[in-house]
Structures are given as structure tokens and as C-alpha cells.
Amino acid sequence: MKRSLLYSGLMLALLGVFAGCNKDSKSDENWKDIPSNQFTAESGKAEISVNSIPVSMGNVKLTASSATEGVLQMNNVIPCASSVAVNVNLKNTGDSKWAFSGEGNIYNMAVMSLFSTDKTPIYTVSVEGEIDGNEKISIKAATKVVAKGGMEGDWNLLREAAPDKDRVPVVTPLQITWTASGDYAVSAAMMGKMLSIFGSVQLADQLDRLSFTEDGNVTARYWESDEDSGNSGIPDMKEFDGIIKKLVGPDGKYHFVPTTHTEKEWIDLPPANLAFWYANGGNLFVLPNLSVLSEMEGAQADAFVTRAADLSGLSELLEELQKLGVDPKEILPVIKNFMANGLVMKYVVTDNSLQLFMDKELCDPIVKPLLPLLDQLDKKLEDMAKNPDITEEQKAELQKLQTLMGVFGLTKPSDLKAVWANTTEFAVAMNFVR
């Protein structure tokens, strides 16, 4: 009797174990019900944000490999990174819902999608979200710069400089270094000096700070007028001495301050995923997020950049440039380089100062293909000079330009072609401090 009871109890226990195992096995198989189809932001079934900014384009796909692991594929979701795959951990939260989270690396960023074999991560991306059986998915993604190069943080435009022995500022907010050989040495030196001063006055009025954030955003404190002043921006050489005197303060130093607005009128551009940055090999790469810029209106979106990155409009752009004398074969590499790398500048970080600059090595591939445009400018100015119907304002602007060219030792804009051909050193730089 005891043996019978013991046997019956053992059988019941075994049945309970088998039933429990069968129940767990069935529960473990629920992960196979996780939707593995592609979700698009445009459809409304994918609610996505990157750095807390909602994403309106792109598609995602979650592929589960077990009850605890899967891969989240994001296409055209992370700005400037066309395809990003992240290994995620899965957790069943009930009601046919699964939470996921994970972190991955980004090895290549580009204005447009390009194949890369680079194995050094420049960004990390972390994700968390939820997917349910009703085929809806929510994702919160956050990016973080790995390739910082000492650039991260706020950089204020240089606004104060001591004079050198010739009473010229030793450094300026916008600094142009220009050296040429032979008969063009004086012209290059004069242009470097004058344009540094005039350019610094303009820059000091329009830019106060650049910020390179940890999540990769490039932001700025800047100023722009709501009204068109009608000013062509051509420097008036008659005002040069007066400008120099106004820049010198009681302390004998040069002070570059806003001239058309107050300090309280600066505009802060918040992080909005408009442009991303990373530093590598002594170069700073700034990549515009074209998917966002193309949705912006008016002057906020740069037409050339948008059209150059739109393959359907590229041929039209090249045709227009060809009509102006630009060889499409020479300008195409410039456009392709921009598509791959965005805006590329060299940089030097020293203690609490930063210099961003483009030297002759970076400028040459851009300047040379565009030099034929100067011939068109020659003709335009010649036609203006012969036209008796131009306005008094146009006459004044033409006179300023002719005076400026005379100071630089030029008779017409196309003379710059010879100056550039004999240029031995060139750099245009912006200087910042912490």
C-alpha cells in the first residue's frame, strides 16, 4: 500500500514537472510572434526619436533570434548614417509587448550613403523601445561622439587681440593668410591683411559661439537681421582707417564686438539634428542633415547643398555651372567629396583656444574649378560700367569694387587667377576661445 501511494505521488510530481516544462516551453516560444516586418516612420506605425528629436523619415526592423536577444536595423533614421544595426536585449512585458535596449557603433557618417570599410567607430548609438503584436514600434535613440579630438564643448569667438609692433592685431576672429611669389606677393599680402579686418568685423557681428555637443550636434549663437539692408557687403576702402580706430579700445587692444545689434539680441540655435560633427586625423567633419534641411523654408536651407546632394538635380546643377564656364569633370569631385565627408576643416586645439581653418590643400580642389567664373564676372562688371541706366546705388557699389581691386593691385576680377596660380601659402581661419 505504501509503495502504491509512493508510486502514485511520484507520478503526480513527474506530471506536474512535465506540465510546467511544457508551459515554460510554450512561453519561451512567444518571441517568435514578435513582428519582424519593416516599419516606416511615414506610416505612423513607427514612433522614433533621435536625441529627443522626432524622426519623420526612415524605416526600422527588429529581428529576434531568441526570447532575450535580437537585432534592430535602422535605415535612414540616424542622421548622416544611412544604415545602423544594433544588438538588443529583449524582455517580454506582457500583453504581446516586448521591450528592447542596446548599444552599437557607427563606423561611417556621410551626407549621402557611401560604402565604407572603416573599422574604427566614430559614434556610438544607444536605443530603447517597445514593440507589440499589433505591429507598432517605438524607439528612442541617442548618439554619442567617440572621435572628439578635444573639440567637444562651447567655443566663443575671439574678440580681443593685442597689437604687434606695426600696430596690427596679432590675431583676428577671421584670419586670412595669403602669400604669393613674384609680382603677386604684394597683392596677396594686401588681400590677406585687408580681408582679415573687414571679414572679422562682419563675423564678430554675426557669430558669437559655436558648440560641439556630446551627442554630435553642432549648434551656434548667432545673429541675422529680418530685414534686407541691400548692402552688397563690398568693403569701402574709405572706411578702413575709421574701422581700425573704432576697434582699438582704451587699453590699446583690438576689440571685435557686434556693430548692428546688442549683446541681448543673439539667437541661440538649439540642438535639432541639423548638422553633426566628428574629428579625425586633425580634421573636423561637419555633416549637414539634408533630410531635415530639405524640409526647412527659405534661406534656412542652402539651395546649392540640397541640390548637389539630390542625385536627380545633380545633372541640372552641373549644366548650369557649365554655362558659366565651369568644367563639370572638375567640379564633380568637389561635390562627391562633400557628399562623402560634408564640410572638412583642419583644426588646432591649444590650451583654451581653437582654430578652424582651410589651407591651400583643402581650398585648391574647390577654388580651381570655379576660377572660370571670374571671366563671367569681368563681363558683368564691364556691362554695368557701360550701362547708362544703372542706379546710383549700383554705380556706388561698382566704384567701391573698382577701388578695392586697385588697392589689391588688380584691374579686373579674373586677375585673381594669376594670383592663385602663384600662391605659395593660403589659409582662411576662424579663432575661438573657451
PLM region spans:
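Residue-level recognition of conserved beta-strand positions in structured domain cores
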Residues: G102-G104, A141, Y222, P288, ...
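Hydrophilic extracytoplasmic domains
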Residues: L247, G252-A275, A279-R434
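N-terminal glycine/threonine-rich, aromatic-flanked beta-hairpin/loop signature
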Residues: V55-N87, P169-A303
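Short, surface-exposed beta-strand/loop "edge" segments at domain boundaries and coil↔beta transitions
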Residues: I78-A85, Y107-F115, V145-G149, D164-R167, ...
